[in-house]
């Protein structure tokens, strides 16, 4: 049996995979799963296949303004562009002949052709259109009620010898696989979805050493001092994923007023008891927000009550900052939060559970934990309802 958890990118790819799956056996099932998210995934990869013209222009302008050239970390400190996107843009322009940029050791240096370089828009658009057409044909295959093998053959300009294959689910609907399942297995699957917690590992290094050193009054060294490091934490779920992950956006964006359900409190208590059976948490606080000032504190207070711990609001947001999800690389993510929090009141000693709704880059937890540790907390354990990370920095 061969199973595709999502649609292949094209009919040709799918046909080749079907051929490999059935090779050397007399009989095999091929099951293609599809859902609404398939088009979203395909669209994401199509859109991210080439660098954005805006990013390329900004990168080349920065390199052109530097006689000695710039390294990737230096580029990251100058522009709000993800490291992976900077690397993608540089790889793309350096593949051009002639190239507007060359690499000299760790730095990227402009060539005399830099001022004349233009992104090949027509070629990029042509390839993008081809990929959209491939995606549309794959969608049509999934929706088709005709013989599926004949559909594939027509797409490959190789008409089938017989009008019907007499094997696919459209030709033989009575031979389709059963849709009923063992209730015990369904229950186990539901339990698995509700136990999709992920570790929150502490960041060990600053992204912008000079800015962090000035803010915390410490030596300008790359490594974050041990006394300012948060402990390892946990994210309860994967944002938007089945089970608990869907309850987080429901509570934050669709509930009126925004409110996280008691089911999330129950699951958090269960996770903390399972993950930290021997570690004693001594108090609870949360990351403050000026956009939704009561959402996370309300949840953290209910969680603290269930854990029989005091809830102490000791962090205050001092200014409005752009959402962290708009910060594309580590330097901008770190510096967006420098000076954004302050301590109000007295910070209890002992191990603190620091609660937030979502975690992505981990810089919010990193900066807030450093502030709490410097103010007297003995340890800070971060806890988020969902991991919303999409990768990158």
Where do the model's predicted regions map?
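C-terminal helicase lobe
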Residues: 1-196
């Amino acid at each position: 049996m061969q199973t595709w958890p999502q649609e292949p990118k094209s009919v040709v790819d799918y046909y080749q995979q079907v051929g490999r799956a059935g090779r050397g056996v007399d009989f095999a099932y091929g099951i293609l799963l599809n859902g609404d998210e398939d088009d979203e995934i395909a669209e994401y990869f199509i859109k991210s296949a080439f660098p954005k013209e805006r990013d390329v222009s900004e990168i080349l302008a920065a390199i052109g303004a530097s006689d000695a050239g710039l390294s990737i970390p230096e580029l990251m400190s100058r522009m709000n562009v993800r490291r992976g996107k900077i690397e993608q843009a540089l790889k793309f322009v350096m593949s051009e002949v002639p190239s507007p940029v060359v690499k000299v050791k760790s730095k990227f240096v402009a060539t005399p052709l830099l001022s004349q370089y233009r992104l090949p828009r027509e070629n990029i658009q042509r390839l993008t259109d081809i990929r959209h057409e491939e995606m549309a044909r794959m969608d049509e295959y999934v929706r088709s009620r005709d013989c599926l093998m004949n559909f594939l053959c027509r797409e490959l300009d190789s008409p089938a010898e017989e009008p019907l294959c007499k094997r696919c689910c459209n030709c033989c609907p009575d031979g389709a696989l059963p849709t009923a399942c063992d209730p015990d297995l369904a229950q186990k699957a539901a339990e698995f979805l509700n136990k999709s917690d992920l570790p929150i590992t502490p960041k060990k290094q600053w992204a912008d050493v000079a800015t962090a050193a000035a803010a915390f009054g410490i030596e300008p060294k790359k490594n974050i001092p041990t006394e300012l490091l948060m402990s390892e934490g946990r994210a309860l779920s994967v944002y938007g994923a089945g089970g608990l992950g869907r309850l987080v956006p429901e509570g934050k964006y669709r509930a009126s007023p925004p409110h996280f359900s008691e089911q999330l409190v129950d699951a958090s208590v269960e996770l903390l008891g399972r993950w930290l059976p021997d570690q004693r948490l001594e108090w609870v606080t949360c990351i403050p927000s000026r956009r939704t000032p009561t959402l996370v504190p309300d949840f953290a207070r209910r969680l603290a009550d269930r854990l029989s711990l005091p809830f102490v609001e000791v962090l205050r947001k001092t200014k409005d900052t752009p959402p962290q999800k708009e910060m594309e690389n580590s330097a901008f993510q770190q510096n967006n939060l420098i000076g954004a929090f302050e301590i109000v009141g007295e910070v209890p000693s002992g191990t603190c559970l620091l609660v937030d709704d979502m975690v992505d880059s981990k810089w919010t937890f990193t900066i807030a934990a450093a502030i709490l540790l410097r103010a007297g907390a003995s340890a800070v354990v971060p806890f988020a309802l969902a991991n919303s990370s999409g990768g990158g920095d």
